[in-house]
Amino acid sequence: MTLSAYLALALILFCIGLYGALTKRNTVIVLICIELMLNAVNINFVAFAKYGAHPSVHGHVFALFAIAVAAAEAAVGLAALIAFYRSRKTVQVDEANSLKH
């Protein structure tokens, strides 16, 4: 595959994730879409590390670091989601403003 194929794949994944994050009301789906967007960025890191002007391992290492951070973010997000569900019995994004009161 060429660099443009990887970039096109990453663009498609990012757009799908962005669309889902902006239009869906279920918090679980929004978290999944955010993870999809992060994976699209990781594809860009690896593609530029392989096909860039100076190919190196730095892009791969940064992608691994981003995956670790995304895993921690997903764990914190799901923990917050469980706490929200226990208090409000819903996982809809529209109900999240009720946490203020």
From Swiss-Prot:
Family stated for the protein in its record: Belongs to the complex I subunit 4L family.
Gene: nuoK
Origin superkingdom: Bacteria
Record's catalysed reaction(s): a quinone + NADH + 5 H(+)(in) = a quinol + NAD(+) + 4 H(+)(out)
Protein's name according to its UniProt entry: NADH-quinone oxidoreductase subunit K
Alphabetized InterPro entries for the sequence: NADH_UbQ_OxRdtase_chain4L/K, NUOK/Mnh_C1-like
Enzyme class: translocase
Function noted in UniProt: NDH-1 shuttles electrons from NADH, via FMN and iron-sulfur (Fe-S) centers, to quinones in the respiratory chain. The immediate electron acceptor for the enzyme in this species is believed to be a menaquinone. Couples the redox reaction to proton translocation (for every two electrons transferred, four hydrogen ions are translocated across the cytoplasmic membrane), and thus conserves the redox energy in a proton gradient.
UniProt entry tagged with the keyword Transport: yes
